[in-house]
């Protein structure tokens, strides 16, 4: 089947009562993004011509969160079953296309399994994804005659013999648009739930002489749905275990794979070492021989070769050239940039600031809206005072500057190359090159000073 002649319908109208949340169920995050986004991503990777998202509860929130302009939004005002949901989308189906039906709360479905399902779909028939369970209680059973699928019966409507069947319906199927529209128009709600079941089209297709081909997923977790937070947490751990396995096989050393979370994409070089409880968010790119210490969080960062991030550092939208060292307990906020061999130590925060080649900020400093040259020493307790209560201002420090401890640089201000700022100085005016600047109150000694004594 040609992917150019395919549309996807994603059912996402459920409220998710058992989540006990005001957030629509399909927006609850798995691996850092809404679970329905995983399904949308799979549909896009398949090359679907159209992706129809059927929504109900929390429509405005869904639209504000899922901003991909390629989605076609289909309202299901009343939730009257899966068949009813598909009926709402049916007017959008082309007669000559195949339509793949997915679920927003089944987030781990793989592109590989869906490709096999579409390839297995008989001409004019239905491709159906099924699994076999040791305990199929509660699920719709696959009814076969002479090994051919002839129908699906829901658990509540099944007789005792049918309840012994262990092959169950996952709900995922693909069918021709023209046939699907006709079968959807023939559905009724004459069942124990009083709902329109999409599963009834299997019997309708069989009655039309159409063949139904069943395909099994590569892993059972691919078709596990989410109805409560326990199930969501289970799928999160399954997903993370799979990502850890892929990284290990690709040469990344995860010192404790069970305590690593990938909530985005990790692009990596060779000989990477990542300690326990590290979280990767967004897109993170690591060069060769990078070491990430325990408890670090990296989001949308580029880390050069031979860098070391010590434990409990948080980096977001930061760029590090080669041979940089960061932390422990450092924070690099968006716009932080370190040149080759730069060092940021414990309890140093950077935001929209560049630290030049070989420059160091070792301890307890804030560097915001700053351009810092090469071979600069930033003493402990240095603050770039960048905010005047209304606007942000820039601090520029030239090459080879030595900034003493407990220095405040009140921006906008610039410091010429080679200058020295004495400890405890508040800089309010520009400094030229090779100057010594200090602005302390003269130290006074009073002999025999007696501190006040509390009255008893």
Swiss-Prot record:
Ranges for region N-acetyltransferase: 251-456
Keywords: Acyltransferase, Cell shape, Cell wall biogenesis/degradation, Cytoplasm, Magnesium, Metal-binding, Multifunctional enzyme, Nucleotidyltransferase, Peptidoglycan synthesis, Repeat, Transferase
Disulfide bridges in this chain: none
Single Gene Ontology MF annotation: magnesium ion binding
Pathway: Nucleotide-sugar biosynthesis; UDP-N-acetyl-alpha-D-glucosamine biosynthesis; N-acetyl-alpha-D-glucosamine 1-phosphate from alpha-D-glucosamine 6-phosphate (route II): step 2/2; Nucleotide-sugar biosynthesis; UDP-N-acetyl-alpha-D-glucosamine biosynthesis; UDP-N-acetyl-alpha-D-glucosamine from N-acetyl-alpha-D-glucosamine 1-phosphate: step 1/1; Bacterial outer membrane biogenesis; LPS lipid A biosynthesis
Positions of acetyl-CoA binding: 380, 386-387, 405, 423, 440
A biological-process GO annotation: peptidoglycan biosynthetic process
Binding site for UDP-N-acetyl-alpha-D-glucosamine: 11-14, 25, 76, 81-82, 103-105, 140, 154, 169, 227, 333, 351, 366, 377
Binding site for Mg(2+): 105, 227
Cofactor: Mg(2+)
UniProt main location, coarse: cytoplasm
Subcellular localization: Cytoplasm
Cofactor note: Binds 1 Mg(2+) ion per subunit.
Region spans: Pyrophosphorylase: 1-229
Chain spans, region Linker: 230-250
UniProt catalytic activity: alpha-D-glucosamine 1-phosphate + acetyl-CoA = N-acetyl-alpha-D-glucosamine 1-phosphate + CoA + H(+); N-acetyl-alpha-D-glucosamine 1-phosphate + UTP + H(+) = UDP-N-acetyl-alpha-D-glucosamine + diphosphate
EC number: 2.7.7.23, 2.3.1.157
Pfam families: Hexapep, Hexapep_2, NTP_transf_3
Domain of life: Bacteria
Subunit structure, interactors included: Homotrimer.
Physiological role: Catalyzes the last two sequential reactions in the de novo biosynthetic pathway for UDP-N-acetylglucosamine (UDP-GlcNAc). The C-terminal domain catalyzes the transfer of acetyl group from acetyl coenzyme A to glucosamine-1-phosphate (GlcN-1-P) to produce N-acetylglucosamine-1-phosphate (GlcNAc-1-P), which is converted into UDP-GlcNAc by the transfer of uridine 5-monophosphate (from uridine 5-triphosphate), a reaction catalyzed by the N-terminal domain.
Similarity comment text for this entry: In the N-terminal section; belongs to the N-acetylglucosamine-1-phosphate uridyltransferase family. In the C-terminal section; belongs to the transferase hexapeptide repeat family.
Protein name: Bifunctional protein GlmU
Organism (species): Serratia proteamaculans (strain 568)
This protein's encoding gene: glmU
